Regions:
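A short helix->beta-strand "capping" segment at the edge of beta-propeller domains
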Residues: 27-45
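Conserved beta-propeller blade signature
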Residues: 59-62, 104-107, 150-153, 193-196, ...
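Beta-rich, blade/repeat-based domains predominating
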Residues: 42-56, 89-101, 133-148, 178-192, ...
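Structural signal for beta-propeller blades
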Residues: 68-70, 113-115, 159-161, 202-204, ...
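Bacterial N-terminal signal peptides that target proteins for export
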Residues: 1-12
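Short loop/turn segments immediately following the C-termini of beta-strands
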Residues: 65-66, 110-111, 156, 199, ...
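Short loop/turn segments that connect beta-strands within beta-propeller blades
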Residues: 74-78, 119-123, 165-169, 208-212, ...
């Protein structure tokens, strides 16, 4: 007997988008499945994980959103080994994760609408409290941390991106473009270029280091993405957008040109169902929070 799993209308629409992209140009990076994380060190199941963060020391941190906790793992030679659970009362609904240069964790809580700071051992250190001029309260939609531990906070309510140093002092403010759909993420590359992602129009805007405004980067990639919600850059300058509803990754060049898609919809290892965040390490390993499959997957990425 054949058993079919129900697919909602958004995924059906997304399949059309994925098929439309299949005839596009050759991709610049290929992803190969390496490992899958379903459980913690005590054999407990993950529940709708939305966040992942990793570093070059082999540390992987997962925001196990449905269980209101963080989980740490060690990564070595393609194997992922569970380590510890981090569960603090100051985190109710962790969704986005970043690690700073010291292994400290920064976590966006969607319910509290705050970014929490935890040390490398998981002890709560307080909430990020930015004080930009003329703004009563910063309400983060998303954020990133760069190699110098500078913080980039997207506040869609204020229609701005705030840049702060490691002490929390605001050093720059970038207004969001007025002619846009819905900004979902901010990113920064190794050269200090700041990017914002418009999910509705599937466009990326960029601001060079020291710039005071965003400019459009290339054309819309809406023909190849259904609803991109997360953006990051690899160490070769390729931008990767997580297409949440399209269950895949869209690759863009430094000029915003479309380079191709990777991964697709499904429930077996190597396939995705409503992915939310991706992190990359210097070795080329990629970790994807595969939210609706209740797992995190590890891929090796190979330049093509």
């Amino acid at each position: 007997m054949t058993v079919l799993r129900a697919i909602d209308a958004r995924v059906i629409v997304s399949l059309v988008v994925v098929l439309a992209a299949s005839g596009a140009r050759a991709q610049s990076v290929a992803f190969k499945h390496q490992a899958t994380v379903y459980r913690d060190a005590k054999d407990g199941k993950l529940s709708a994980p939305e966040g992942v963060a990793c570093n070059d020391a082999g540390l992987l941190v997962i925001a196990d959103t449905g269980n209101a906790r963080l989980l740490t793992y060690f990564v070595k030679e393609g194997a992922v080994t569970p380590a510890a659970e981090v569960k603090v009362p100051q985190l109710k609904h962790p969704v986005r994760l970043q690690l700073d240069s010291k292994g400290n964790m920064l976590v966006l809580d969607r319910k509290l609408r705050k970014i929490a700071r935890l040390d490398a051992k998981g002890a709560f250190q307080g909430y990020v409290d930015l004080k930009p001029a003329g703004v009563t309260e910063v309400v983060p939609t998303s954020f990133k941390v760069d190699r110098g531990d500078n913080l980039y906070v997207l506040d869609t309510a204020a229609a701005k991106v705030f840049v702060a140093d490691s002490s929390g002092a605001v050093t720059a403010t970038l207004p969001l473009p007025a002619d846009a759909g819905a900004f979902m993420d901010v990113a920064v590359d190794a050269g200090g270029i700041v990017y914002v992602l418009d999910a509705v129009r599937a466009t990326v805007w960029s601001a060079a280091k020291g710039a005071t405004a965003f400019s459009p980067l290339g054309k819309s990639f809406k023909d190849y993405a259904s609803f991109p919600t997360y953006l990051t850059a690899n160490n070769r300058g390729v931008l990767l957008a997580v297409d949440q509803n399209g269950a895949g990754l869209v690759l863009l060049g430094q000029d915003g040109s479309y380079l191709g898609r990777q991964l697709s919809l499904g429930w077996t290892d190597g396939l995705l169902y409503y992915p939310s965040q991706i992190c990359l390490d210097a070795q080329g390993d990629a970790f994807v929070a595969d939210r609706s499959n209740n797992r995190v997957q590890m891929f090796t990425s190979i330049a093509q």
